[in-house]
Amino acid sequence: MKNLGDWIRQIRDFLETTFLQIDHWFEMNEPCRQHKPLNGGWSIDQILEHISLTNHFLLILIVKATKKSLEKKASSPNWQQEVANYSFQLEKLQQVGVHKSFYWMRPEHMEPKGDMTLVEVRLKLKEQLLQCLQVLDQLKDGEGALHKTTMTVNSLGKMDVYEYLYFLAQHGQRHLTQMENNRIEFENLSPD
């Protein structure tokens, strides 16, 4: 069984890997990135913008929960006992990363509008990764397990800061699959 420190390291690695994989898509040629799939879905550029928008709103929740976790640590001398038997919702959270594994109705404010340039989206994603890693640095001793916030997506229920960070990375993984599907369709439709 993993301890909390192992989970924190795994989450850090997963965040870094996911953001690196997402960043790769900015190097894709423009016609491929702008191709809208035949099913009416988003282009790769739109998906990248959506990832950054979703991260923005998730990070608002993560920062608030981080503050509450640190406040709880400061007011509870025995806080480590509260996280001693830590349990991470790995299986439920992994489903988030599987494209079309469940119905997901996103809020309108997370839909891409084309308000940011591709350069701005890429910069925003890099800043968001740094913000995620800073949160992990702030909560390096397990404090992130002290406060839980409800997540309604896929009936995940109450999640701590570490689970929210993992959710954020899994959301990116979900869209990596979608972008790859777009690329394959574009290549199949393109003349040789």
Q: Residue ranges of each PLM-predicted region?
A:
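A short small-residue
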Residues: 1-2, 32, 105-113, 152-155
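Extreme N-terminal tail/first-helix region
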Residues: 1-16, 20
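Short alpha-helical hairpin
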Residues: 22-32, 99-105, 144-152
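Short, contiguous alpha-helical
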Residues: 33-90, 127-192
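Acidic/histidine-rich alpha-helical segments that form the ligand environment
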Residues: 18, 84-143
